[in-house]
Curated annotation (Swiss-Prot):
GO molecular function: RNA binding; translation initiation factor activity
HAMAP family: eIF3i (MF_03008)
Family, per entry: Belongs to the eIF-3 subunit I family.
The protein's name in its UniProt record: Eukaryotic translation initiation factor 3 subunit I
Subcellular location field: Cytoplasm
Entry-linked SMART domains: WD40
Subunit annotation: Component of the eukaryotic translation initiation factor 3 (eIF-3) complex.
Domain of life where this protein originates: Eukaryota
UniProt main location, coarse: cytoplasm
Function statement: Component of the eukaryotic translation initiation factor 3 (eIF-3) complex, which is involved in protein synthesis of a specialized repertoire of mRNAs and, together with other initiation factors, stimulates binding of mRNA and methionyl-tRNAi to the 40S ribosome. The eIF-3 complex specifically targets and initiates translation of a subset of mRNAs involved in cell proliferation.
The keyword DNA-binding is annotated on this UniProt entry: no
InterPro entries: eIF3i (IPR027525), WD40/YVTN_repeat-like_dom_sf (IPR015943), WD40_repeat_dom_sf (IPR036322), WD40_rpt (IPR001680)
Keywords, in A-Z order: Cytoplasm, Initiation factor, Protein biosynthesis, Repeat, WD repeat
Length: 327
């Protein structure tokens, strides 16, 4: 592999994402400036200035015209992806933890943290309705939880959303009938769900958890299909767009890193066969746990973001591209 190492953040990465074509890489970290880069050469195009706290999540619309960020400064911001202008700001009483666009790019979802007397919430706003995009505006969909909702995403067009919780619970809601979840999975994870990502074709969902596992789920009913075990907590997992492979990233908890050798911390990204649940490759690079990862739409590149503040663009070599699994 021939990695590019990108240094544009002062603190630990929280999310990296590719746009639909894969020519741009979007990143955010525990500093206050989300960045956008050229994937091809690692050149930084610019940053989105306006947040005043750690930025926990970033997502980009299918046509790369808008991006959304969720921050610890109690705001979600929608940006003009090309010009970097802030289009809308949504305020809340507690920090925003995750965010995402729907398939059409017209709806934006986000989760908020549970804090003091405020419950954790999941909200959906419609960008086409300006009354929803102002402070105090009513949400298109609104739900409260006793347990922290840590991650959420749209899993089917603009209709279904899946939410992961600190307790390991997974729930799926239909926005057309929002009263109760249509599917629930309480058994797949024992600890916090750190990340949820959809397969490129939209038929599978992969969840990463602090219980040292990642799970492949049927997007229609959240039924567990496969489970991948690691030696350390899994912070992020992604699915290859053109092969039956998945990749896990994580490592020893960031609080323990100063007491951990690089080899014992399991800071490598690990590639598993999707069907056989067996690890067959891993790649190193980060000095500290991997917090986030994304598979490029071409299937030949993985981007990882670590606690060390670096983004690594890992391009696969011929050994991987020509690899066939013996079974």
């Amino acid at each position: 592999m021939r990695p590019l190492s990108l240094k544009g953040h002062e603190r630990a990465l929280t999310r990296v994402r590719f746009n639909r074509e894969g020519d741009l890489t979007f990143s955010c970290a525990k500093d206050k400036k989300p960045c956008v880069w050229y994937t091809e050469n690692g050149e930084r195009i610019g940053s989105y200035d306006g947040h005043n706290g750690a930025v926990w999540d970033i997502d980009v619309s299918w046509d790369t015209t808008k991006c959304v960020t969720a921050s610890g400064d109690l705001t979600v911001k929608i940006w003009d992806a090309e010009l970097g202008n802030c289009l809308y700001t949504i305020n809340h009483q507690t920090p925003m933890k995750s965010c995402g666009f729907s398939y059409s790019g017209n709806l934006v979802c986000f989760t908020t943290q549970k804090m003091t007397k405020n419950l954790s919430t999941f909200q959906v706003r419609d960008l086409r309705d300006s009354s929803q995009m102002v402070e105090g505006g009513e949400s298109f969909f609104y739900s409260q939880f006793d347990v922290n909702a840590t991650t959420a995403l749209f899993t089917q067009m603009d209709d279904l959303v899946t939410i992961g919780f600190e307790s390991g619970l997974l729930q799926q809601y239909d926005l057309r009938n929002p009263d109760t979840p249509i599917h629930t999975n309480e058994s797949v994870h024992r600890y916090s769900v750190q990340d949820l990502q959809l397969s490129p074709r939209g038929d599978f969902l992969i969840s990463a958890s602090r219980d040292k596992t990642a799970a492949l789920l049927d997007v229609n009913d959240l039924k567990k299909l496969k489970q991948y075990k690691s030696e350390r907590p899994v912070n992020s997992a992604c699915i290859s767009p053109n092969r039956d492979h998945i990749c896990l990233g994580g490592g020893e908890d960031a609080m323990q890193v100063t007491q951990t050798s690089v080899s014992a911390g399991h800071f490598e990204a690990k590639i598993y066969h999707m069907v056989f649940e067996e690890e067959f490759a891993r790649f190193k690079g980060h000095f500290g746990p991997i917090n986030t990862m994304a598979w490029h739409p071409s299937g030949t590149i993985i981007a990882t973001g670590g606690e060390d503040g670096y983004i690594r663009i890992q391009e696969f070599d011929e050994d991987y591209l020509g690899f066939t699994y013996d079974f």
